[in-house]
């Protein structure tokens, strides 16, 4: 990953990534870091709330505090939104404008897509089509689930048939 930063003037790095130290050490870029778990980062997510249909948190850093409400559930969305917001700021987008864009962001159909049911359970569609992808989505759902997770998945189409037994195990 650190090869991405060898020629960059600016670098936005997830401080919680196991490769963060190597990426920071291997760059001459101006580095901005972000984290959910570590206070040593330039920006941190505080008071993270994983809800069935969204994620909320406070972004704190460089004398700025902003409340983020993102209609894409899961902890991975916190990381993705922090990285996107900081990259936008590096490109000159004002902090409050970048926050507003995150609030308006919608997920992609078929990727952790919440289906309204007006019931006491939540239905989520995700187009995970590999063993790793299925494992990641189920891990993300475990973070926000308040009960059982029932998983129905298919392996149709022209996808690699050798993945199917691994996905079912």
Regions found by a protein language model. Give the residues of each.
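Acidic, Mg2+-coordinating active-site environments of NTP-dependent enzymes
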Residues: 1-122, 146
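Active-site flanking residues adjacent to catalytic metal/cofactor-binding acidic residues
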Residues: 13, 125, 153
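Anionic group-transfer/hydrolysis microenvironments
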Residues: 16, 128, 156
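Conserved cofactor-binding/catalytic machinery of classical short-chain dehydrogenase/reductase
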Residues: 83, 129, 133
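Active-site beta-alpha connecting loops in nucleotide-dependent enzymes
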Residues: 108-110, 132-169
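Switch II (G3) loop of P-loop NTPases
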Residues: 122-129
């Amino acid at each position: 990953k650190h090869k991405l930063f060898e020629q960059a003037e600016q670098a936005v790095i997830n401080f919680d990534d196991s490769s963060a130290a190597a990426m920071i050490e291997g760059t001459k870029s101006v580095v901005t870091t972000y984290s959910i778990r570590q206070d040593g980062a330039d920006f941190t997510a505080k008071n993270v709330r994983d809800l069935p249909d969204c994620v909320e948190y406070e972004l704190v850093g460089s004398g700025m505090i902003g409340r983020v409400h993102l209609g894409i559930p899961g902890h991975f969305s916190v990381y993705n939104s922090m990285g996107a917001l900081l990259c936008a700021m590096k490109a000159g987008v004002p902090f409050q404008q970048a926050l507003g864009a995150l609030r308006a962001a919608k997920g992609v159909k078929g990727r952790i897509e919440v289906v309204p049911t007006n019931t006491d359970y939540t239905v989520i569609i995700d187009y995970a089509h590999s063993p790793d992808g299925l494992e990641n989505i189920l891990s993300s759902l475990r973070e926000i689930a308040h009960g059982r997770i029932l998983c129905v998945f298919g392996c149709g189409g022209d996808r690699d048939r050798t993945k199917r037994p691994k996905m079912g195990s």
